[in-house]
């Protein structure tokens, strides 16, 4: 497939410098080594060259569409991308100033630079001396993760997917680096999270009042420990809860009245009970039968 047709399908047909640089990288790849040894086909090689060229010119590249066109999984594509990039000796760089200008967050530049330097110091201090020399902090994912965390801390909206596409990494690797930075440099990147009670927020409280089933457990626990308060306190209660309390009070009044009436109608257990004698008047025919039976 021709490079220009692949670029048009990826939405890069209007960027002539990107297409020219990708064609140059493809020729360099053919001269330097055989990409088939790495398991990279011709179409995938052209797509990776386009992505490297797009990252070099700071042009947005649709990686999801590129993975779909290559016919590979995301992990296999990233592995092939890194192998081809290392084979060509090309390293993508991501400047903090360019990110600040592109996303409209110029005031974050000093915070990002401070956080990156602090993360490097603390990360290297935690590593053994034998591994410190091989650690590479020049990868764009560190700059992008630092920029994203600073924007999140200062409550600025930044497109995370756009950042991931710019740094040329996967979402899982970006999340891993972001978590590591937030853990090591919580004073620079961390965000204090406090779980607020839903009843303390006015909007949530009104929403819960509309859905009585959501407050069932709260009503049961509150009604067991609450006593009858003032009229002002009752007015402050939500509508559903106020009706519930009125129904409970009416039920208690009815229950007490029933119990008191039962006590009044109940006989006194101290008095002895006497069985009444039943004297029925006998008919003359019954008396004649008794006399005849006695005579026999």
UniProtKB/Swiss-Prot annotation:
Record-linked InterPro entries: ORC6_cyclin-like_2nd, ORC6_cyclin_first, ORC6_met/pln
Positions with biased composition (Acidic residues): 220-236
One GO BP annotation of this record: pollen development
Organism name: Oryza sativa subsp. indica
Name of the protein described by the UniProt record: Origin of replication complex subunit 6
CDD domains: Orc6_mid
Main location as per UniProt: nucleus
Annotated Pfam families: ORC6, ORC6_2nd
Record-linked Gene3D superfamilies: Cyclin-like
Record's subcellular location: Nucleus
């Amino acid at each position: 497939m021709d490079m220009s047709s692949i670029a048009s399908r990826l939405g890069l047909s209007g960027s002539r410098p990107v297409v020219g640089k990708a064609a140059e990288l493809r020729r360099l790849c053919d001269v330097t080594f055989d990409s088939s040894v790495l398991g990279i086909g011709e179409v995938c090689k052209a797509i990776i060259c386009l992505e490297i060229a797009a990252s070099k010119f700071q042009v947005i590249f649709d990686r999801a569409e590129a993975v779909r066109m290559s016919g590979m999984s995301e992990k296999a594509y990233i592995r092939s991308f890194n192998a081809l990039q290392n084979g060509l000796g090309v390293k993508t760089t991501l400047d903090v100033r360019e990110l600040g200008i592109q996303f409209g967050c110029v005031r974050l530049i000093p915070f990002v630079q401070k956080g990156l330097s602090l993360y490097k110091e603390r990360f290297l201090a935690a590593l053994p001396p034998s591994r410190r020399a091989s650690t590479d902090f020049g990868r764009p994912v560190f700059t992008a993760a630092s920029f994203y965390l600073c924007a999140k801390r200062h409550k600025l909206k930044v497109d995370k997917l756009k950042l991931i596409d710019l740094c040329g990494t996967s979402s899982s690797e970006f999340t891993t680096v972001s978590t590591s930075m937030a853990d090591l440099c919580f004073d620079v990147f961390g965000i204090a999270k406090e779980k607020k009670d839903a009843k303390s927020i006015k909007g949530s409280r009104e929403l819960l009042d509309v859905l009585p089933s959501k407050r069932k457990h709260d009503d049961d626990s509150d009604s067991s420990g609450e006593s009858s308060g003032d009229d002002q306190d009752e007015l402050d209660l939500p509508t559903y809860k106020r009706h519930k309390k009125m129904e409970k009070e009416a039920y208690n009044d009815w229950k007490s009245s029933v119990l008191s009436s039962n006590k009044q109608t109940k006989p006194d257990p101290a008095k002895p009970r006497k069985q009444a004698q039943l004297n029925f008047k006998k008919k003359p025919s019954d008396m004649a039968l008794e006399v005849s039976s006695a005579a026999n």
